[in-house]
């Protein structure tokens, strides 16, 4: 296994490329609207300071989720603004990259716009593994008649040994299901 480098890939002919995404996060709290933002700064959620929303949410969580919130907190941005009831998989997951305790502002790894629907998310090994397994099984079922000739797996830094406690977790599931 290599930990650095680059790969080049050229494809030609009559090919179909399908994309499968496993976010590996589960929603927590309520769906909210961004009421104030500036670039990647989240200034208001339903008229409240985002950090205050998080503090209230924290008080309602069990010990395990409270621990996860301290280092595995994400913001899910609803991808389709016309969805009435977005569910897991309908969100573009973005990192919470900073916070200002004085103003209650959160910095997010995405430019935000007022009116967007968002919900906080947590990532844990169990949810992440189940999500990957489910999307790969669905892909395999949907493509049963097509012979898959190749596949590429791109995994983010938040997964792998850091999340699961051992190497190759995602690769093993990928190999088994595809």
Please place each PLM-identified region on the residue numbering.
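Small-residue-enriched flexible segments
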Residues: 1-164, 168-177
